[in-house]
A protein has these predicted regions:
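Iron-sulfur cluster-binding electron-transfer modules in prokaryotic oxidoreductases
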Residues: 1-224
Length: 224
């Protein structure tokens, strides 16, 4: 497996340790005995979603094509699966037809979970499958792997949008606060888990509990 660190995960560390989601993925894979490698020169590339979603489709498409060509070369024309550490980026990239095998980190963690020895705790966690996970039909990946980490997992009965919308919550912080309060006015969990760094930041600011990455949760829940 090859790992492509998303722009948001590169810039915005997954937790207070400063360890990124991709770095956690490497540590987890090593624990499982699964060979992985973070792509060289990944910092020169972006999937283009940040530009496309702001209306700059031309530059977004150009960056996406450039990244796809880069990944095609590094993966030996699609022979090596590529893991992406942020669900919105995975979903955006999979919209473009290619010979690449692009895997979301939640799917990757589910693939290797039986190679890991979990030490679940009883800390209650709220698990939020982001919109892109819902669109990919992969919401159960996040929930199932979270249940290996905690004996008390809470999630929404119905899928909902947290209102973060990429960087929109940075400009309009009232969006995630309003979206979450309407969906879960009586949240009792001690911490939150998701698979998008920007959503984690927006939810942390809006709902009163800290949201972290699924990679961080898994790493801190396995026997070292």
């Amino acid at each position: 497996y090859l790992i492509f660190p998303s722009c948001a995960s590169r810039v915005l560390a997954a937790d207070e340790t400063g360890v990124s989601s991709s770095e956690y993925l490497v540590k987890i894979a090593q624990n499982a005995g699964v060979p992985v490698k973070i792509l060289d020169k990944y910092s020169s590339h972006c999937c283009g979603m940040a530009f496309d979603s702001r209306g700059h489709q031309k530059i977004g498409t150009e960056m996406n094509i450039d990244l796809m060509n880069f990944l095609n070369d590094k993966s030996e024309l699609g022979a090596i699966p590529i893991v992406i550490d942020m669900s919105p980026c995975t979903q955006f990239m999979n919209q473009r037809k290619s010979d690449l095998t692009l895997i979301d980190s939640t799917e990757f963690l589910n693939r290797i979970q039986n190679k890991l020895e979990f030490e679940p705790n009883d800390e209650s966690i709220f698990v939020h499958p982001v919109c892109s996970s819902q669109k990919m039909g992969r919401t159960t990946d996040l929930i199932e792997i979270s249940k290996r980490c905690s004996t008390s997992v809470e999630t929404s009965l119905e899928p909902f949008c947290c209102g973060t919308g990429g960087d929109r919550s940075l400009r309009y912080p009232e969006l995630p606060k309003n979206a979450f309060n309407q969906s879960h006015p009586d949240l009792k969990s001690q911490k939150g888990i998701s698979s998008s760094r920007t959503c984690e930041m927006g939810l942390t600011e809006s709902c009163g509990i800290k949201f972290s990455s699924i990679e961080s949760l898994v790493y801190h829940s396995i026997k070292k």
